[in-house]
Amino acid sequence: MRESEDSPSPKRQRLSHSVFDYTSASPAPSPPMRPWEMTSNRQPPSVRPNQHHFSGERCNTPARNRRSPPVRRQRGRRERLSRHNSISQDENYHHLPYAQQQAIEEPRAFHPPNVSPRLLHPAAHPPQQNAVMVDIHDQLHQGTVPVSYTVTTVAPHGLPLCTGQHIPACSTQQVPGCSVVFSGQHLPVCSVPPPMLQACSVQHLPVPYAAFPPLISSDPFLIHPPHLSPHHPPHLPPPGQFVPFQTQQSRSPLQRIENEVELLGEHLQVGSFTYPPSAHPPTLPPSAPLQFLTHDPLHQEVSFGVPYPPFMPRRLTGRSRYRSQQPMPPPPYHPSLLPYVLSMLPVPPAVGPTFSFELDVEDGEVENYEALLNLAERLGEAKPRGLTKADIEQLPSYRFNPSNHQSEQTLCVVCMCDFESRQLLRVLPCNHEFHAKCVDKWLKGNRTCPICRADASEVHRDSE
């Protein structure tokens, strides 16, 4: 290298040329490509730590005056494309060492938006706020409506996401393979094949959308690597499967009730495709390693632009399940309602059958009335009957004389008038005195004393 290349201006030119080269990799006359329209074959190559083709092969001619690139540059680009495809396929089975990943981070001062996704170690990811926006537009033919997720604040000790990199979205050939149930509602989640979206883990299992299952619930999720069945269609990606896993960490009962994620049943129609029963992945053998993902270090926000699909929840917890299984009790039967309804119907009396509901009701009422009468006879009257005229005349009476009157009572309680001379007074067995006309009228309806409520007929029984 010449000494002039170490000056700051050629370095800036090299960086600008690398930017122009990335943008010129796609065909020029085609319209601007959107992220969801790009396939896995259009991803540009990733940067190797021991390859510096970007600085050595750039010419100093401005981008607008350059013509077709030389043959050696095209051959090197094709070799890097093939090498990147082989590396992205083998990334699930080998892991780059930590020092090599740091070497990848250092020489790259600029990250273009269409750089291929690469594995990031949790310790190598800086604690910064990155945002990933996956927008799935209506590419499915009258199918599910787009769902957009916003993931923010990746902690250094959590699961690193390929934030800041290009995440290809689903097209009509990449149908969602799994769904997430949030609080009783099934939400279809886009399933991206493993070579297109990967997250680093200890075992490096292919994670289809591993960043999005723990969105609302706080349960960790057990991720199974997708296995293709023999009858799996070749144009469909391998479907993912999320299985809830109970850990020993302490959680509140509300979180245990709300956090449920399950796979949708067989023949679930997503978009214009229907999964047959054979398309579901088989169970994972016991010897395969499993990776646990927790949602604690990820503070995420979810924005759904569409209403939830009309799926009913499968599992109900606690008392709600017991209440839903109990049938509603039948309404009570009113015997007087049916004859009334039948009488409203226009049925001829000669043709219509005879009904005996009213007779049965009347018989029951008559029996009840007779029983009440028998009870009244045994108990007697609540209010005793008045005395007869003969019984009233048998009570003692005398003319009032103020000179020889010995009783302390000086007035009649019935009429509230004082006793006068030569008035006829009647004395009850309780020794209470009244005007004869006043007390006789009282005793015709009552057999007790108006003052003390004593029985006025006891004198007659004693005399008899």
Swiss-Prot record:
<feature type="region of interest" description="Disordered">
    <location>
        <begin position="1"/>
        <end position="94"/>
    </location>
</feature>
<keyword id="KW-0539">Nucleus</keyword>
<comment type="pathway">
    <text>Protein modification; protein ubiquitination.</text>
</comment>
<protein>
    <recommendedName>
        <fullName>E3 ubiquitin-protein ligase RNF38</fullName>
        <ecNumber>2.3.2.27</ecNumber>
    </recommendedName>
</protein>
<feature type="compositionally biased region" description="Polar residues">
    <location>
        <begin position="38"/>
        <end position="53"/>
    </location>
</feature>
<keyword id="KW-0862">Zinc</keyword>
<dbReference type="InterPro" id="IPR001841">
    <property type="entry name" value="Znf_RING"/>
</dbReference>
<dbReference type="GO" id="GO:0061630">
    <property type="term" value="F:ubiquitin protein ligase activity"/>
</dbReference>
<comment type="function">
    <text>Acts as an E3 ubiquitin-protein ligase able to ubiquitinate p53/TP53 which promotes its relocalization to discrete foci associated with PML nuclear bodies. Exhibits preference for UBE2D2 as a E2 enzyme.</text>
</comment>
<feature type="zinc finger region" description="RING-type">
    <location>
        <begin position="412"/>
        <end position="453"/>
    </location>
</feature>
<feature type="short sequence motif" description="Bipartite nuclear localization signal 2">
    <location>
        <begin position="64"/>
        <end position="79"/>
    </location>
</feature>
<dbReference type="Pfam" id="PF13639">
    <property type="entry name" value="zf-RING_2"/>
</dbReference>
<feature type="short sequence motif" description="Bipartite nuclear localization signal 1">
    <location>
        <begin position="6"/>
        <end position="20"/>
    </location>
</feature>
<dbReference type="GO" id="GO:0005654">
    <property type="term" value="C:nucleoplasm"/>
</dbReference>
<keyword id="KW-0479">Metal-binding</keyword>
<keyword id="KW-0808">Transferase</keyword>
<keyword id="KW-0833">Ubl conjugation pathway</keyword>
<dbReference type="GO" id="GO:0016567">
    <property type="term" value="P:protein ubiquitination"/>
</dbReference>
<dbReference type="GO" id="GO:0008270">
    <property type="term" value="F:zinc ion binding"/>
</dbReference>
<keyword id="KW-0863">Zinc-finger</keyword>
<feature type="compositionally biased region" description="Basic residues">
    <location>
        <begin position="64"/>
        <end position="83"/>
    </location>
</feature>
<dbReference type="InterPro" id="IPR013083">
    <property type="entry name" value="Znf_RING/FYVE/PHD"/>
</dbReference>
